[in-house]
A protein has these predicted regions:
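Mixed-charge, Lys/Arg-enriched low-complexity segments
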Residues: 4-9, 65-91
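Acidic, low-complexity, intrinsically disordered interaction modules
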Residues: 22-80
Length: 91
């Protein structure tokens, strides 16, 4: 995992200071976008072992290449993460 990927992944889990943390990576050569926010049906094991099949996915890409996908069961939280990802590298 690159430094940028690590920063992005940590930032999506921690809303504080996200823009400042990512600012040094945001220049004309790096384009960060959350390309999709969608409801998906997938077997997903929670940390407590419960299985759920209706979850939400945010796919974050950099320069058109998928870097990581984040899954969650709470629509509001995932929408916030989607909006955050869209906002992170905007000037």
């Amino acid at each position: 995992m690159t430094d940028l990927e690590r920063v992005l992944k940590n930032s999506l889990h921690n809303f504080k200071n996200t823009k400042e943390t990512c600012k040094k990576f945001c220049n004309n050569t790096i384009v960060l976008t959350a390309t999709t926010f969608e409801r998906v049906f997938k077997n997903y094991s929670e940390s407590n072992g419960n299985m759920i099949d209706k979850i939400y996915r945010v796919i974050v890409t950099i320069d058109g290449q998928t870097r990581f996908e984040h899954y969650g069961k709470d629509a509001n939280e995932m929408n916030n993460q989607y909006l955050l990802a869209l906002d992170m590298c905007q000037n």
